[in-house]
Amino acid sequence: LREPDLWWQLRSGQWMVENFAVTRSDLFSFTQEGVEWINVKWFFEVLQYFFASLGGPELLLLMQTFANILLLWMLYKLAQTVYSLQLVKKFQVGIAFIISVLSFLFAMDYRMAGRPEMVSHVLSLAFLLLLLNHRREKSKGIFWLIPLQLFWANSHEAYGTGLVILVVAIAAHLFESRIRKWEPLDKNFMLSSLLAIASTGINPRGLYLFIHPFNIFNQVGDNKFTTELYNIQTNYFWQQTEAWLAIGVLFICLIGFFLFRKKLGSPGILKQFGLAYFVLFVLFIYLGSTAHRNLTFFFIWAFPLLLLTIESIGQWKLKNIKLFG
C-alpha cells in the first residue's frame, strides 16, 4: 500500500455503509469541507471498506490480485480471439504470448496499487475483448457491455473511457455497414451499445454523469501538484520508464500495422480488426500523452497488435533460420 489517499476512500466507504447514503459533499478535508463532491467511485469505496473490514487495509491488495487475475484471463481470451484473425498461426501459449503478457504486466505495474482505477483497467480490456470477439462470433455476449458500463459509471471516474469506446464503435460500425458496405448492420451490437451508453445515467447523480467527464478532464488539466497527472510536455513524464515503454510498444505496433497492411491491404486490415480499433488506438495514444497515469489505457489497447507483431516477427525469423541454417 503506497497511495496516500486510500484512507480517504476507506473512510468514505465506511461513512456510506454506516449512513446508508452516498456522499454528496466533502466530509474529510480541512480546506474543502462541505463543498459539493461528485463521488463517482462510491460503489467501489463501499467494496474497499468491505474488504478492509474483513482483515485490515492490507486486503485491498487482495482486490488488486483479483483484478490482476481477471486481466490475465482476459489477455488469454483476447489472444485466442486475435489469433483467429488468421494473420498468424493458430494460437498457443508460446514465446510471443509470454513476452507480450510480461511486457504488459511490467508496463502496468506502476498503477496496480489497490486503487479504484483497477476497475477502469479491467473494464477497458473487457470492452476490447467483447468488441473484437463480436467481430468473429456475432454472439449475444456483446450485451455484457450494458452491466459493465453501469458498474463502471458507479465505480471510477474514468467511466467516460467506456462512453468514448462505445461512441467510436457505433460510428465506425455505421461507416462500415452503411457507407463502405463491408457488412450488414448489426442490430445486436447497436442495441447493446446504445443501452450501455444509456446505463451510464443509472447512478446517484443521474444524467449529470454524461457531462461530468468534461469537468474531470478540465480538473485534471488544472492540477499542477499531482505528479501522476503530468503530461507529455513535462520533464517528469519523460523521466518515467513507462513513457519510453510506450514509445517502444508504439514502434513495434507500427511495424506490425505495416506488415499486415502489406499482407492484406488497407481495407483488409481494417476489416479484420475493425475501424474502431484503430481510431481508438490513436485516441489512446493521445490520452496517454495527457497524463503519466493514462498510459495504462494505451498499453491495454495496444496488446492485440503487439502480440500479433511479435508472433509475426518470430515466425519470419524462424523461417529464415530454416532457409539459411
Language-model segments: which ranges?
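Transmembrane catalytic cores of multi-pass membrane glycosyltransferases
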Residues: D5, V17, V22, E157-G268, ...
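Hydrophobic/aromatic-rich transmembrane helices and adjacent perimembrane loops
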Residues: Q9, I165, L287-G314
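Short hydrophobic/aromatic helix or loop-helix immediately within or flanking a transmembrane segment
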Residues: T31-E58, L62, F66
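Transmembrane-helix motifs of polytopic, lipid-linked glycan transferases
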Residues: L62-Q86
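Membrane-interface alpha helices of multi-pass inner-membrane proteins
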Residues: F104-M108, L129, G141-E157, L195-T200, ...
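Short acidic/glycine- and proline-prone juxtamembrane loop motifs at membrane-interface regions
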Residues: Y110-V119
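Membrane-interface transmembrane helices that cradle and orient dolichyl/undecaprenyl
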Residues: L125-I142, I255-F257, R261-G265
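Short hydrophobic alpha-helices at membrane interfaces in multi-pass membrane enzymes
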Residues: L130-L150, K187-L191, Q272-F281
